[in-house]
């Protein structure tokens, strides 16, 4: 696993691909330091939002050389447990985001996201700009 790895969430990658300064600057720094980690879920979310063919090429270029975490059956089970635990506290996260949070927790990674609901996940390290 990448030392000091950072899972860069879909919300940030979308802004990066659009060239929005805050995301572009930080993601570029993380890429140059070889700290970016992603997951199949995040890749699927990016691909789902493609509007033009050239965007697919940009995503492929971005992801080349980036470590990709796989979501195993035990991780899905843990994501379900976390989702259930959060719901009992009145917090509902999309299951995809719960799985991303568990990936970060299980791999001792930081999550770079613009989605505020991740702050509700206990012990999740959020990347600070």
PLM features: residue spans?
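Acidic, PIN/NYN-like endoribonuclease modules and their adjacent C-terminal/linker elements
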Residues: 1-3, 101, 105-129
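Short, well-structured N-terminal submotif of metal-dependent ribonuclease cores
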Residues: 1-38, 48-61
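Histidine- and aromatic-rich ligand-binding microenvironments
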Residues: 8-9, 39, 92-94, 115
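Generic structural signal for small/hydrophobic residues in well-ordered secondary structure
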Residues: 9-10, 46, 79, 104
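A generic structural signal for short hydrophobic patches within well-formed alpha-helices
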Residues: 13-14, 43-46, 76, 118-119
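A general structural signal for well-ordered alpha-helical segments in protein cores
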Residues: 23-24, 43, 56-59, 76-79, ...
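Active-site neighborhoods of divalent-metal-dependent phosphate/nucleic-acid chemistry enzymes
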Residues: 67-112
């Amino acid at each position: 696993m990448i030392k000091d790895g950072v899972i860069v969430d879909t919300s940030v990658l979308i802004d990066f691909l659009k060239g929005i300064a805050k995301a572009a600057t930080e993601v570029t720094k993380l890429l140059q330091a070889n700290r970016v980690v992603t997951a199949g879920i995040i890749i699927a979310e990016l691909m789902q939002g493609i509007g033009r063919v050239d965007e697919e090429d940009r995503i492929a270029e971005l992801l080349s050389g980036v470590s990709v975490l796989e979501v195993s059956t035990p991780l899905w089970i843990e994501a379900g447990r976390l989702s259930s635990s959060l719901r009992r506290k009145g917090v509902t996260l999309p299951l995809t985001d719960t799985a991303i949070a568990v990936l970060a927790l299980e791999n001792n990674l930081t999550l770079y996201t613009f989605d505020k609901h991740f702050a509700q996940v206990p012990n999740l390290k959020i990347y600070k700009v």
